[in-house]
Amino acid sequence: MASIDLTVETEIAASPADIAAVMFDPQREPEWMPAVKTVEVIDPALQPGARVKRTASFMGTDFSWTTEVEAVHFPHVLTLRIADGPFTGVISYNIQRSAGGSVVRVRNAGETTKLGFVPASMIEPPMRAAIDASLGRLKNIVEGERVKG
């Protein structure tokens, strides 16, 4: 198994609450995460223990995974444990106010389970690029909604 630990961040010209309203809503993930194809909310409340199943495509492979909320401190922190899928570990969303709005960080830390034969050095660059692209889409959505609202 390959160990992965990467963090990607961007600045978004919006409040943490405006960002979290999109970022912490699993139903909106396909809007800002191109890899995510479907979302099935198993437990609708945003609270520890709540589960969501997703399907996605990454590096030419279709797969699904289930996350469980470990911690939520709206609108600043959402920590998800990956309960099953091709990757086990934790995804953390962190939103902190900044001079220009908010700094948004996504951290993925864990191990591959289904891609164990592929070294981390081959997984991390496309994963980092995918997260960076997702944060760019999130930025466009949130800043666009802010202008409309």
Regions inferred by a protein language model and the residue ranges of each:
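Hydrophobic ligand-binding cavity/cleft-lining segments
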Residues: M1-Q47
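Generic C-terminal helix-cap and adjacent flexible tail
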Residues: A2-S3, P16-A17, N140-G149
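Intrinsic-disorder/low-complexity, polar/charged segments enriched in Ser/Thr/Lys/Arg/Asp/Glu/Gln
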Residues: S3-E11, R51-K53, S64, V77, ...
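Beta-strand elements of well-folded, non-transmembrane domains
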Residues: I12-A14, F58-G60, G110-K114
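A short, structured loop/turn motif at beta-sheet edges
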Residues: A13-A17, P44-Q47, E70-P75, N94-V103
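Short beta-strand segments that buttress and anchor functional surface loops
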Residues: V52-S57, L78-D84
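Beta-strand/loop substructures that line and gate deep hydrophobic ligand-binding cavities in soluble
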Residues: T79-A133, L138-N140, G149
